[in-house]
Amino acid sequence: MSQPFKEAMFYTPIENKGVVCNLCRHRCKILEGRLGTCGVRYNKGGKLLTLVYEKIIAAHVDPIEKKPLFHVCPGSSSFSVATVGCNFHCDFCQNADISQVKIKASPESEPSPEQIPGEQLSVEQVVEIAEQHHCKSIAYTYTEPTIFYEYAYEAGKLAHRHNILNVFVTNGYLTAEALKEIKPYLDAANVDLKGFNADFYRKKIGAKLEEVLDSLKLMKSLGIWIEVTTLIVPGWNDKEDDLRKVAHFIYAELGEDTPWHISRFFPHYKMMDVEPTPVHIIRKAREIGLETGLRYVYTGNLPGDEGEHTYCYHCNKILIRRYGYTILENHIKEGKCEFCGAVIDGIGLN
């Protein structure tokens, strides 16, 4: 049986029963009877409700490498969950069937719990399932964890009491106040930095690049372990100059120890007419990252590529040999390179 909708966190009442949602950096002004840009936060009579609390559309046990998080408990499993909805509207979204779900709502037609796609999965159940499958972490992923923040926040608190880590796979559009509130329970995040082109962010995503950069810097200052992913879309964010700007930002603002995952685009959603990213561009981007001084630069969606492996930044030997999400060798012992003793950056590198 569906539960009543839960009151949302982070909003401010305004005139005429309107509200301003302060969860993400859009800071939507939501009139009575309307939804935010994420499509899952509804203003009912001046009270902001989350429509997706404990309503899960996807739940799987994944290798942590799939997030991708290569420096968080390598080889472990992560119980991964999502609700419908997203505060971005990327033309190239690979999960558009669940992220871009349209929920009907108006002042005359209030949404009902039965309308919301997904199955009821309580906070207690998500932690219990993670334990049953010996998962070292719970990943809030697939769509955008920001828009099911209340669920992630409550599950995250409980997970920590059971010695389970919490990780976000996020577009990095949380407000500073939302990030600071969840910081005690958020151990790591893979953040999509979709390029360094403000025009690309505005036209193809509907967001502001500068806001994402501010979030990344704040996460770093809060002590959250960060890995960055850039999906390279031909003709949009594949220029060498833009890639150098991404690499330099990571190096200068997040640190040389921040992993950068460079991912190959395949046609999807509203960009079916765009060709897959040429492999040489992915490899060139990795080269740029290494030249900039980043220690760990990875190629994504290229199974078998040498860029899948983790190399020691000191002796250059392969520390973790991968094929796709599978670990074939691991030469990190007690957080150090087995060959030269260099300290390798990350969480749970045993």
Regions found by a protein language model. Name each.
Residues M1-C21, R25-T83, A96-Q100, E308, ...:
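N-terminal [4Fe-4S]-dependent radical SAM core
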Residues M1-E32, G235-N350:
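Auxiliary Fe-S-binding modules of radical SAM enzymes
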Residues N22, V84, F88-D91, K157, ...:
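Core alpha-helical elements of the protein kinase catalytic domain
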Residues R34, C86, N197:
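A generic "binding-loop/recognition-motif" signal
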Residues G46-Y153:
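Extended interfacial segments that mediate partner engagement and assembly in macromolecular machines
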Residues C90-C93, F168, V228, C337:
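Hydrophobic packing within well-folded, soluble alpha/beta domains
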Residues G118-H280:
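Conserved AdoMet/S-adenosylmethionine-binding subsite of the radical SAM
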